[in-house]
Amino acid sequence: MASIDLASTPLTATQNVDPNEIKKFEDMASRWWDLEGEFKPLHQINPLRLNYVLEKANGLFGKRVLDVGCGGGILAESMAREGAQVTGLDMGKEPLEVARLHALETGTKLTYIQSTVEAHAEANPHTYDVVTCMEMLEHVPDPLSVIQSCAKLVKPGGHVFFSTLNRNVKSYLFAIVGAEKLLKIVPEGTHDHNKFIRPSELLKMVDHTALQEQGITGLHYNPFTDTYRLGSNVDVNYIVHTRLF
């Protein structure tokens, strides 16, 4: 049911891609759908992310949706099951293969493409009703370029969602010391705190596009119950909702 286009342009130094980041996630790709593996946090937060998108975008049924930095397809597949026409975009070949195979196993219909968001935006301007870019901005050299490309890809009136990690002492303690070093929730080295993005910085980048911020919410982890919830505090993880008018 899933189709995949791996005929992308070769990886070059001019692309907005960090080869080390690509390799890191390719090495873990086979375990992407292991609910107790390295990507357990993504599986845990996915219902929250999905419900947030559904609420703000007034549902996804029949809409064209692009998931930028889709990896193994956790969010992309869940949006497709809501009736959306989903395209998942990533530069990692192995995660895309895993995503395609999982979609075949579950009978989920969607399309995966190996491409940078910049190249996809050039070829597909104002194509999508909804664009999601979750936990991806902190893994690329130039997050502004990604945000600008997302703005090009969405239709007028459409929605664009960004999620990333705040850069402060608390996020270092929670995301690096706690999650990676102590609790081992994610592999050590998954994140670079210097690449985290403050909400004020992300919103300034949004201001360089035609997108308009519609709201921001935090994503909170409770280590005692091993659960996540949405809330007003954006000290660590957060999601920004924007629209193109």
From Swiss-Prot:
Gene3D superfamilies: Vaccinia Virus protein VP39. InterPro entries: SAM-dependent_MTases_sf (IPR029063), UbiG_MeTrfase (IPR010233). GO terms for molecular function: 2-polyprenyl-6-hydroxyphenol methylase activity; 3-demethylubiquinol 3-O-methyltransferase activity; methyltransferase activity; polyprenyldihydroxybenzoate methyltransferase activity. S-adenosyl-L-methionine binds at R49, G69, D90, M134. Its EC number is 2.1.1.222, 2.1.1.64. Keywords: Methyltransferase, S-adenosyl-L-methionine, Transferase, Ubiquinone biosynthesis. NCBIfam families: UbiG. This is Ubiquinone biosynthesis O-methyltransferase. The gene is ubiG.
